[in-house]
UniProtKB/Swiss-Prot annotation:
Lineage, top ranks: Eukaryota, Fungi, Dikarya, Ascomycota, Saccharomycotina
Keywords: Mitochondrion, Transit peptide, Translation regulation
Entry protein name: ATPase expression protein 1, mitochondrial
Pfam families referenced in this protein's UniProt entry, alphabetically: AEP1 (PF17049)
Origin: domain of life: Eukaryota
Species this chain originates from: Vanderwaltozyma polyspora (strain ATCC 22028 / DSM 70294 / BCRC 21397 / CBS 2163 / NBRC 10782 / NRRL Y-8283 / UCD 57-17)
Cross-referenced InterPro entries: Aep1 (IPR031467)
Length: 432
């Protein structure tokens, strides 16, 4: 880390407080500064200052800054934010002097390094190969089950249906207490053999919710039933409409209360959570998707590329619908914990998303530095040549900076590709 190398140049003996100040009028005046930016408020998913940037920052006497002091850092204000509605804004990072840079950089790097890991596990997941349980029940052995089957066949998911279903189910369980017939066995049998429509699934899901406090007493049992529901949804290609999604979320919410936990789904296995993540993405529930994906990332369990790309597509849809003016800011917020994924991925499409959402060449350089460390860097960067050139031009604010940044980009291309820069990329490069 460059901190230890440059500390002696820009750190006084008694540094007790770190400050990054945002100028409002005169950058040289104390009145021109407002509340310091805490590094933990910065939610940039992939920007890290390089050693050269850190050295330059600590060597600049007058108004040292990151990313040229431009307001391109995505900030989340924790005191004004909720998990569903974060308060986001762009800010610039400019210091009044070199005095407090080192402690600030230490904190900034610590926050980001503590979540970094070279170890990661890609979930080997196929939705139609979920670990379901084979039911051993039959109507021949349990003829009273036919009543439940008949109710299912005629249901529309209404209150009367669920009431009658519950009466019959409880009656069967009471009569069969001596045979150790468990309620989860009945649910699994019905889901596997008779739940063929969304109204039927809604009815059974509501019934499972009602029995969380009477029969389903372990999270592992609930996970078995959730697996059956998820397998059914994926195999039948059910559309997750609002009623079905609310019913399913109601089940999980009741499970949180039952098992006295913030989120019972976090206790599921990685394969179950990934299947559930697919469900949330298909239902375009971006907040639940972000929450569950964040849990997987924190466990160093990364979904397959196709699921990550589906999540990124969902972000683009949601951001466009909600606030096109601050699209990049919101996209970075929804991917604020993606550093390890970006650092480890070899998929150009994932990296393209972050290139397109860069607002400064330093951000582009961060992506390029990650690619540079990969063995197959040539295969990764080739499909991105045009995107990198065009984005470099768009984030450069003058002819001089455009020329300088394109020269730097050319150096990256030469290192990674040698003379094998794609013809189309050469043509675009020459035109710029």
């Amino acid at each position: 880390m460059v901190i230890s190398k440059v500390a002696s140049k820009c750190s006084p003996k008694n540094v007790t407080q770190s400050m990054v100040l945002v100028p409002s009028r005169n950058i040289a005046s104390r009145k021109g500064f407002v509340k310091p930016i805490d590094p933990k408020e910065i939610i940039h998913p992939f920007y890290r200052p390089s050693q050269i940037e850190e050295f330059t920052l600590c060597s600049t006497e007058r108004n040292p800054s990151l990313m040229d002091g431009k307001p391109v850092f995505p900030i989340s204000l924790p005191l004004l934010s909720t998990s569903v509605l974060p308060q986001l804004l762009y800010k610039k990072i400019i210091f009044p002097s070199v005095r407090n840079i080192v402690p600030w950089l230490k904190k900034f790097n610590y926050i980001r390094i503590k979540n970094y890991s070279d170890e990661y596990y890609t979930i080997d997941f196929k939705p139609l190969e979920m670990p379901t349980v084979e039911s051993k029940l039959t109507i021949t052995n349990f003829p009273e089950l036919k009543i439940l089957v008949d109710l299912l066949e005629n249901t529309n998911g209404g209150r009367t249906d669920i009431h009658n279903f519950e009466l019959c189910l409880n009656n069967i369980l009471q009569k069969r207490m001596s045979t150790r017939l468990f309620v989860e066995d009945i649910y699994i049998y019905l889901i596997q053999n008779y739940v063929t429509t969304i109204p039927k699934l809604i009815l059974v899901t509501k019934s499972i919710k009602n029995h969380l406090n009477n029969g389903i007493d372990h999270l592992s049992i609930l996970e078995k039933l959730v697996n059956e529901i998820l397998y059914l949804v994926h195999s039948k290609k059910f559309t997750m409409d609002l009623v079905l999604m609310n019913t399913f979320n109601g089940l999980l919410k009741e499970a949180d209360n039952k098992f006295n936990t913030h989120s019972s789904k976090f206790g599921f296995s990685e394969t179950t959570k990934e299947s559930l993540l697919m469900l949330y993405i298909q239902a375009e529930d971006i907040h639940s998707s972000k929450e569950l994906l964040g849990n997987l990332i924190s466990k160093k369990s990364y979904p397959k590329d196709e699921i990550i790309l589906a999540y990124l597509d969902l972000i683009n849809k949601a951001v466009y619908k909600s606030n096109p003016e601050n699209a990049i800011l919101q996209r970075l917020s929804y991917t604020s914990n993606f550093f390890n994924i970006i650092n480890h991925t070899t998929n150009p499409e994932i990296l393209r998303f972050f290139i397109h959402n860069s607002r400064h060449f330093k951000e582009i350089q961060c992506v390029l530095d990650m690619i540079l460390k990969k063995k197959n860097r040539k295969d990764i960067v080739l499909p991105l040549c045009i995107d990198l050139i065009e984005k470099t031009v768009s984030v450069s604010d003058s002819a001089v900076s455009t020329s300088l940044n394109l020269t730097r980009l050319s150096d990256y291309f030469e290192t990674m590709l040698g003379m094998n820069v794609r013809i189309e990329a050469k043509e675009v490069f020459m035109k710029k």
